[in-house]
From Swiss-Prot:
Purpose: Component of the cytochrome c oxidase, the last enzyme in the mitochondrial electron transport chain which drives oxidative phosphorylation. The respiratory chain contains 3 multisubunit complexes succinate dehydrogenase (complex II, CII), ubiquinol-cytochrome c oxidoreductase (cytochrome b-c1 complex, complex III, CIII) and cytochrome c oxidase (complex IV, CIV), that cooperate to transfer electrons derived from NADH and succinate to molecular oxygen, creating an electrochemical gradient over the inner membrane that drives transmembrane transport and the ATP synthase.
UniProt catalytic activity: 4 Fe(II)-[cytochrome c] + O2 + 8 H(+)(in) = 4 Fe(III)-[cytochrome c] + 2 H2O + 4 H(+)(out)
Record's signal peptide: 1-16
UniProt GO MF annotations: copper ion binding; cytochrome-c oxidase activity
Name of the protein in question: Cytochrome c oxidase subunit 2
Superkingdom: Eukaryota
Subcellular compartments: Mitochondrion inner membrane
Subunit structure comment from the entry: Component of the cytochrome c oxidase (complex IV, CIV), a multisubunit enzyme composed of a catalytic core of 3 subunits and several supernumerary subunits. The complex exists as a monomer or a dimer and forms supercomplexes (SCs) in the inner mitochondrial membrane with ubiquinol-cytochrome c oxidoreductase (cytochrome b-c1 complex, complex III, CIII).
Chain sites annotated for binding Mg(2+): 226
Organism from which the protein derives: Mycosarcoma maydis (Corn smut fungus)
Classification of source organism: Eukaryota, Fungi, Dikarya, Basidiomycota, Ustilaginomycotina
Membrane topology: Multi-pass membrane protein
Chain ranges on the Mitochondrial intermembrane side, renumbered to this chain: 17-43, 102-255
Length: 255
């Protein structure tokens, strides 16, 4: 743990959304998008459990009751049943509809950029990220921009995460509609932060955009999710979400 703004005293960054060793499930969602993804996953998983047990029960019943060892005649007459055919045709269709509509709704919401209050331009390089805050101008009349490299393992301090910590974090405010415009400078990369529900391709010559609203303070980690070369696994992403007051103080420090 360490202070984001040492001159301001006890403002300590919170590592509450970092991945855990041997973690299988989702990280805690910190945006409406990730919360929606988690909810959709849980709903579909519920359907899958019922389907698996239902199919297992039918198969077990058929194996036990309709086998040639038990009766050589009974299975010969089980060759047609209009009702059961309707059931196994209509039921999967209803299940697919129950899955499809929430999925489409979430996909359209993820694709919508709703009146962003600020824009962060992100470019993927081999093998680091660069960020530009074009909404803010420093004393030289230039936008705020910086490169973000992974901190080598030998330089890590107490509390910093191996292969995830960077020298310059992307600092953004909470409770603010933020637009990320993402591109690639050389090859295809992928800008992904699981706890924020962000995953967008960084393609050279193309601008892709997505939006996010972060609901709480914290440090949110991600990695390039598109194989981009020999050091693909060494270009992490670290987004630090702070209150608007701390964010403005950070902007002043960058200017």
């Amino acid at each position: 743990m360490f202070n984001l703004f040492p001159p301001f005293g006890a403002n300590t960054a919170i590592f509450n959304d970092a991945p855990q060793p041997w973690q299988v499930g989702f990280q805690d969602g910190a945006s409406p998008t990730q919360e929606g993804i988690t909810e959709l996953h849980d709903s579909i998983f519920f359907y899958l459990v019922i389907i698996c047990f239902g199919v297992l029960w039918v198969l077990s019943s058929v194996i036990v009751n309709f086998n040639s060892n038990k009766s050589q005649l009974v299975y010969k007459y089980a060759n047609h049943g209009t009702l059961i055919e309707l059931i196994w045709t209509i039921t999967p269709a209803l299940v697919l509809i129950a899955i499809a509509f929430p999925s489409f709704k979430l996909l359209y919401l993820m694709d919508e950029v709703i009146s962003p209050s600020m824009t962060v331009k992100v470019a993927g390089h081999q093998w680091y990220w660069s960020a530009e805050y074009s909404d803010f101008i420093n004393e030289d009349g230039e936008s705020i921009e910086f490169d973000s490299y992974m901190v080598p393992e030998t330089d890590l301090e107490d509390g910093q995460l191996r292969l995830l910590e960077v020298d310059n974090r992307m600092v953004v405010p909470i409770d603010t509609h933020i637009r990320f415009i993402v591109t690639g400078a050389d090859v295809i990369h992928d800008f992904a932060v699981p706890s924020l529900g962000l995953k967008i391709d960084a393609v050279p010559g193309r601008l892709n955009q997505t939006s996010v609203l972060i609901e709480r303070e914290g440090v949110f980690y991600g990695q390039c999710s598109e194989i981009c070369g020999v050091y693909h696994g060494f270009m992490p992403i670290a987004i630090e979400a702070v209150t608007p007051e701390k964010y403005l103080a950070w902007i002043d420090s960058q200017a």
